[in-house]
UniProtKB/Swiss-Prot annotation:
An example molecular function term from Gene Ontology annotations: structural constituent of ribosome
Source organism of this protein record: Polaromonas sp. (strain JS666 / ATCC BAA-500)
Gene Ontology annotations of biological process type: ribosomal large subunit assembly; translation
Top-level taxonomic group: Bacteria
Protein name in UniProt: Large ribosomal subunit protein bL20
Keyword terms: Ribonucleoprotein, Ribosomal protein, RNA-binding, rRNA-binding
Gene that this polypeptide is encoded by: rplT
Length: 119
């Protein structure tokens, strides 16, 4: 069985890890042993935060809808309840965008909701 020299694969592996650690501060970006740990930790943060991002955006959308609905004289919870009763199935992302960029349309939806809640 021939002897296997690992120089080529080791260099490739080191290059790959150091490329992933590009832009890291200090030795985390240029020393393989430390960069390897930093890249692994960065991957863990990325995995965790891809899930956290969904929660954060939902919170943002709700805060925006709440602010816009309060300017029309109702709270977010009242507005959400009214949407359900009125049978309006627009998601929070679209409602949030509408509240910012098209307040007239959002106002029309609020009026529909108020009418349904009053009835």
């Amino acid at each position: 069985m021939p002897r296997v020299k690992r120089g080529v694969t080791a260099r490739a592996r080191h290059k790959k890890v150091l490329a992933l650690a590009k832009g890291f501060r200090g030795r985390r970006g240029n020393v393989f042993r430390i960069a390897k740990e930093a890249v692994m930790k960065a991957g863990q943060y990325a995995y965790r935060d891809r899930r956290t991002k969904k929660r954060v955006f939902r919170q943002l959308w709700i805060a925006r809808i709440n602010a816009a609905s309060r300017s029309f004289g109702m709270t977010y919870s009242q507005f959400a309840n009214g949407l359900k009763k009125a049978g309006i199935e627009i998601d929070r992302k679209v409602l949030s965008d509408m509240a910012i960029h098209d307040s007239a349309a959002f106002g029309a939806i609020v009026e529909q909701v108020k009418a349904k809640l009053a009835a």
